[in-house]
């Protein structure tokens, strides 16, 4: 794999370019390639110093271009690297950030091995659900709940790609992607690149239509805490603790214990607007001091985040040669925000088709429309009467086997199981939301 670190811009060309070369950062473990400056080749001075530019224009042809090197872009790159039938494909990965910080974590459940099991920070075999009047700790049978730290993931995939000469990484931002007759043109901060196919995982740009669609957030603040006494069960995820006040919204505590004296404790909401940070912190403090009855603890880390939850259509592609990935392709599940496993399934689906046929699959995401309807109904309920969300999840966990609930949330249930799930919850909130969906406009709080 090759790495280039590029910026802008040359006086003697109208094409994208970069400043005179003074210093470049080489990431250990990667080959570094310095392309020849075209100003030098033409005999042009190129800049006031008389020196050639580091790069005045780069145009490289690739089979696949990945716009973005976060979870979605790196996942697709990794799946390509593991497919022997795609070894002859040249792949360009464009990412503006160094990705050398632990900027997030991903949690997910799975009933089998994953390509990233070696970097799983912790896994759990029990899952707890709590609400007023119902509490249960479920023993997981075929599933395991897992967590991966972002920095571990970035390092793992980049190390794998560094050993593979078919990959090139350029630290640059993608400004525009354009379909052309031969494939795709990518205009970037490093110049122009072309490829046969592009995979775009940049954040989506939504033209919001609140009169037609529902726009909520899963927003949270989390504290990683250490205690002086054993208080957490390292085998049990506190998946949802709804025992706190709901305040006409869906509000719960989520806990990932790493040991008896260390855990990540998050206060999470499903609603339209974030809170002042002090309100999240007050809720976490109340949980630690009143629910867990802790008198002393240390906050050693913090997580803050907001994940869009919407039924706004997120197209799987932008023309014949540009495929969307990650949140841009709707891989964050609208009603829960979980994305990591959906990203892996999407990557595997695309790579399998490319390896087998040389072409993209006809159904780019392989999504099933009934689950989109279920998500839309739940989002409508959250928007109209957010506090009812607690009752719906309570009925789901109280009246169904845990494996069925997790399979349903993972969109892997059959039609008979979908019927059993829907039959287990009070119908009236859903019937009212069905009416709103049929009328084509979101419901409002009555």
What do the PLM-derived regions correspond to, one by one?
Residues 168-295:
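Predominantly flavin-linked oxidoreductase catalytic cores and closely associated redox partners
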Residues 79, 88-133:
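N-terminal FAD cofactor-binding segment of flavoenzymes
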Residues 62-92:
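N-terminal Rossmann-like FAD-binding beta1-loop-alpha1 element of flavoenzymes
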Residues 2-16, 24-25:
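Low-acidity, Ser/Thr- and Arg-rich intrinsically disordered low-complexity segments
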Residues 139-159, 201, 271-279:
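Short beta-strand to alpha-helix junction loop
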Residues 174, 245-247, 271-349:
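FAD/FMN-dependent oxidoreductases across multiple families
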Residues 344, 348-446:
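Long, low-complexity C-terminal extensions of enzymes
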Residues 9-10, 37-39, 53-56:
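Cysteine-centered motifs
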């Amino acid at each position: 794999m090759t790495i280039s670190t590029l910026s802008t811009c040359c006086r003697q060309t109208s094409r994208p370019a970069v400043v005179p070369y003074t210093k470049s950062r080489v990431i250990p473990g990667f080959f570094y390639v310095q392309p020849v400056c075209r100003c030098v080749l033409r005999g042009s001075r190129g800049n006031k110093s008389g020196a050639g530019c580091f790069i005045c224009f780069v145009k490289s042809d690739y089979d696949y271009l990945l716009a973005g090197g976060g979870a979605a872009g790196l996942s697709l790159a990794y799946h390509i690297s593991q497919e022997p039938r795609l070894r002859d494909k040249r792949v360009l990965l464009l990412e503006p950030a160094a990705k050398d910080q632990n900027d997030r974590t991903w949690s997910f459940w799975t009933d089998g091995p994953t390509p990233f099991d070696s970097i799983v920070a912790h896994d759990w075999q029990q899952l707890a659900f709590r609400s007023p009047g119902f509490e249960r700790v479920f023993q997981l049978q075929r599933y395991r709940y897992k967590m991966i730290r972002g920095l571990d993931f970035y390092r793992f995939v980049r190390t794998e790609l560094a050993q593979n000469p078919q990959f090139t990484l350029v630290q640059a931002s993608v400004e525009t992607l354009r379909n052309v007759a031969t494939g795709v043109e990518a205009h970037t901060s490093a110049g122009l690149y072309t490829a046969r196919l592009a995979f775009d995982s940049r954040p989506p740009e939504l033209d919001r239509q609140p009169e037609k669609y529902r726009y909520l957030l899963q927003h949270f603040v989390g504290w990683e805490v250490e205690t002086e006494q054993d208080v957490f069960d390292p085998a049990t995820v506190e998946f949802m603790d709804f025992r706190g006040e709901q305040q006409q919204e869906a509000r719960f505590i989520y806990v990932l214990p790493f040991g008896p004296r260390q855990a990540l404790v998050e206060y999470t909401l499903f609603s339209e607007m974030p809170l002042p940070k002090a309100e999240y912190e007050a809720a976490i403090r109340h949980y630690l001091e009143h629910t867990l009855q802790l008198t002393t603890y240390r906050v050693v880390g913090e997580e803050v985040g907001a994940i869009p939850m919407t039924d706004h259509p997120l197209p799987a592609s932008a023309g014949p040669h540009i495929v969307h990935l990650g949140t841009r392709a709707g891989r964050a599940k609208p009603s829960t925000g979980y994305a990591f496993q959906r990203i892996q399934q999407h990557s595997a689906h695309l790579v399998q088709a490319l390896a087998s046929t040389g072409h993209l699959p006809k159904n780019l995401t392989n999504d099933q429309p009934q689950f989109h309807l279920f998500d839309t109904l739940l989002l409508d309920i959250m928007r109209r009467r957010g506090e009812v969300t607690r009752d719906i999840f309570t009925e789901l966990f109280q009246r169904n086997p845990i494996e069925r609930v997790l399979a349903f949330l993972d969109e892997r249930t059959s039609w008979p199981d979908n019927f059993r799930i829907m039959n287990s919850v009070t119908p009236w909130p859903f019937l009212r939301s069905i009416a709103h969906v049929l009328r084509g406009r979101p419901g409002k709080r009555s």
